[in-house]
Amino acid sequence: MITMNINGKTIECQEGQSVLEAARSAGIYIPTICYLSGCSPTVACKMCMVEMDGKRVYSCNTKAKNSAVILTNTQTLMDERKSIMQTYDVNHPLECGVCDKSGECELQDMTHLTGVEHQPYAVADDFKALDSWAKALYDPNLCIMCERCVTTCKDNVGENNLKATKADLHAPDKFKDSMSKDAFSVWSRKQKGIISFVGSVPCYDCGECIAVCPVGALSYKDFAYTANAWELKKIHSTCSHCSAGCLISYDVRHFDTLGEESKIFRVLNDFYHNPICGAGRFAFDVNSSPKGSANLKEAQNALKECEAVRIGGDITNEEAFLIERLRKKLDFKIYNQEAYHFQQFLKVLGEVKRPSVEEIKTSHLVITIGSSIKTENPLVRYAINNALKLNKASLIAMHPIKDNALANLCRSSFCITHEVGAEEILLGMLLKMLNIESAALKSLEDSKQSIVDEAALKALEEERKKALEQAEQGCSVGENKAENQEENKIEIATPKEENQEENKTETKEESAEVPTKTTYLLLEEAGINLETYEKILALLQKSNNTLLVVGEEIYSHKQAHNIAKMLRLLAQKSAIKLVLIPPSANALGIASLCELSEEVFEHEKIVGIRAQGDFTINSDDRVFGKDAVSKVDFILPSLNQLEGTITNIEGRVLPLKPALRFEGYDLSDIMQGFGFVEENLTECTHKLPTEAGFKAIEFDHLTNYFTNDRVNHRGYLLGTSPFEKSAKECETTECEPIKPLKEKIAFNAYLKYPETQFNNATNKSENLQLKAGVYVSKAFLKKLNKEVGQSITLSKEEEELTGVLYLDESLDQEVFVISPSLLKNHSGFFREGVFDSVDLKEQA
């Protein structure tokens, strides 16, 4: 830690921190327009100027210096900022009219803050054509060229789709004499550029550029001219689509003349701390019919008579708690196949420190295994990209399917394709590289073999050739001829020199030396050749802060038990941090609270709670203003209509807040029929079991915000893991030797949602551009002789599934990426995992 003095106040800050971030952490305000926390500074607005030890600097890109004296609000600085704002306000009315940003516009705020009361400058307006991409509308006439959109697209999202390009606009040099240097620089930048979409592939369902825009230049298409900022009520909640559990804010306003019916107009995020994906931003249009259901008795009878309860991966902690209590009372089984595999995995892995998303950003090397990272947890993908761009980290993404979106993040991003089912072997490779002893490595060691080191052999031959040439040149010098021959005998040793007794032994040894390298047949069979092995090893040895991301495909792996034991050993014996991506929004909460059973698809009476069953208790998926699309037997509130909590990837228990009214019953009302006393779900929040890591904190006392020093004050972190006891019992037995791949698994189908699709709510959303369906690469689409939007039927044995065909720009391989929602009751597909071989049924 170092100390600085800002405006007479002594503060402590981290070495390497920018002056701006240090000031913000200490609660000292320095105005900015272009800066985004955690991203590279652009120095576009220059509003963050300060005096540091008597010299003017820009605080966003100036590193904190020990004992520095800084002033942020001298009269000179305030005059300079006012001058800059006057240039921003050229031809811009100070009383904004119909602009959607009015009331929350940073240009308005800064204009008032700096005291701009008149406009001394004027220039002819230029024609600037409107543009649009994905869900964004771009009005360059309102753009101030702060380039926040470019910055977040590059440093957070990792797409590089936006760029500041040249524009031929009026920028008279006469202002150079009347404007200050910084103000003229800002003016020139604004008048000579425009934001353009330069992506090589289309952009879908993102909107982070809309979120960061400080003015009205970028807006959400469906929000345009529908509501004013000051009319909207902000409800801070948690996104429940994936395990990231991002902080979101619902912007809600009455929709009818009586004010009884409310509508979510948009979703915002705290973009300084938490970028969100398109699902969190746009899939807010699905909820339950507000009246709910009245057939409580029918739901209670169904639970009394059932043999099992199938639960969804997004049920709240409180709902999971009630269901587990009822299981103990009625002795039924609880099914959720994804969460079951995750729970079994955790029972072997045990207590492992969960790195925060911020820790991912500070890593030097990130390795992913068993994960299609961009679809499973976008926030983790954003954090990895941020580490690559700002921390100069490297990425090794290991998966049977190459993801070009990851490969193109930067030059230090390496996508390694391997055989299906090889994850256990790859983990053994990491243990070997880290010199961690384990019985698991026996089969790997047994497959060791030596091969000729072609590169070293070539270098040796070059060296010998060079030595021979030198010897021949030496022979031309008479008096040194014999001496040179003697000196070069050993270096030029060949079989012809066998008769030379003096150097006989050395020559034989020299000629017998052939440079070799060690390889492992097990790795070769898994798809890891020697070059790839050496690249991974070099990156691993170079890094002093490595992070291993484990995806959901690992939990259902045939060798999941052994993989979990190997990961526990890795965590204990090395400094590598493990990030486990839960397979659904609240899988960690469910696994911590419920005793799950493996579903064997026998004929049983099953009640589905936020899942399908013979009797279904779930949201009826009503898109606002339309009829419900899902038939359910008892309507529950959707997750944007209730109070409760979920547990995210960091093990953080986070609050859900209702944005829309719901007048019906929830699960706590059903449970009252079994003697439970809780009148609503939040009466369970502080009763969640402490032995499972939860804390006795009431729902209303849960916080949900970030502070300027980037500290996370959202909910609370789980305590001691409930899985450590069982994991210690598993430690009594050694890891099993890694199983070789008996044969390569041929596949042409992969079970995975596209980006922004996670569950029933996202499937039903009409706001999202990416839909559930069958996705293929551009080359495969051409080979199939089909077009996007056509229906395609795939078969497996005697079963068929049909879906709409879409294009995945990040794919190269000839594979059908099938959305899980298409399976429905087609149990013949993907019996052995998420990879399968299917047939294309030709249309009649």
Predicted segments, located by residue:
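Short acidic (Asp/Glu) and glycine-rich catalytic loops that position anionic groups and cofactors
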Residues: 61-66, 189-192, 405-411, 543-550, ...
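N-terminal export/assembly segments and adjacent metallocofactor-ligating motifs
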Residues: 1-24, 32, 36, 40, ...
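Active-site phosphate/pyrophosphate-binding segments
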Residues: 411-483, 487-610, 691-720
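N-terminal leader/propeptide and maturation segments of large enzyme subunits in energy/redox metabolism
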Residues: 94-123, 129, 149, 159-165, ...
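N-terminal single-stranded DNA-binding subdomain of primase/primase-helicase replication proteins
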Residues: 45-63
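Short acidic, S/G/P-rich loop/turn micro-motifs used as interaction or catalytic elements
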Residues: 315-317, 371-376, 553-559, 613, ...
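A cross-kingdom feature strongest in bacterial/archaeal respiratory oxidoreductases
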Residues: 1, 30, 35-39, 324, ...
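Residue-level detection of beta-strand-connecting loop/turn positions
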Residues: 8, 54, 796-798
